[in-house]
Amino acid sequence: MSHIKYDDVSVQQRNIEKAQRSSNPLKEIPESQSFAEFSHNGLNFALQCKLKSDLDPKVIKWAFKLAERNVGNYFKTCKEGWQPKIKQNDLNKNWARYLIAVDKSTKKNVAYTMFRFDLDYGSSVLYCYEMQVESEYQRKGLGAFMMKALEHIVQHFKMEKLVLTVLKNNPDAVKFYHRLGYKKDETSPDDEDYEILSKVFIETSNQSANVLEALS
């Protein structure tokens, strides 16, 4: 982990703006060729990084259906429940970016992450809103590979953190992120059905102060 300290918000903002100008941030990282494809036990996947505006609406529909299959039941036991219209609206946000894994043999989409670059409680972050993998492709290292790709994007654009949310009642997902080194973020609420996890890549000396100021 880098020990550069970003105490100047203007520096963070410039890094965010640079990342936001990129139509394909995965292609810009030095390791882009290493993350273009992933193979496991005879299965071969290609990774595509696209803006929401460049995606066929059918892909967004698939992303929603996959989220519904994977986590719909978990949401149904939470106080706010499963809200399909809100989920559909979230997936269709103009700022949304998608990293999609395609099975090269079938040409079918099998996994995706949805993310954005943002200033979150005073920190420059890549915020991962979704990580969904088709059930038959889970536990093959694909999800971890896609998260690693996001981490390299974070490092390339000098973001401070990669941040994500996970439902507390989804133990497999919680274990998955913990295994990858994600820890409870200082912004995570105590009284919600979800928790915020993060991995810090660039430290700041005033992160806690930024959070307290934003919450006050």
What are these regions (language model features)?
Residues 6, 12-13, 17-22, 34-35, ...:
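Acetyl-CoA-dependent GNAT
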Residues 62-66, 145, 149, 196:
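Alpha-helical elements of Rossmann-like donor-binding domains used by nucleotide-donor carbohydrate transfer enzymes
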Residues 130, 151, 164-166:
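Short acidic/polar micro-motifs centered on Gly/Asp/Asn
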Residues 134-136, 140, 168-169:
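Active-site acidic-Proline motif in GNAT/NAT acetyltransferases
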Residues 139-152, 179:
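Conserved acetyl-CoA-binding loop-helix of GNAT-fold acetyltransferases
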Residues 140, 157-160:
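Short coil/turn segments at alpha/beta junctions that flank glycine-rich nucleotide-binding fingerprints
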Residues 160-163, 167-175, 179-216:
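C-terminal "cap" of GNAT-fold acetyltransferases
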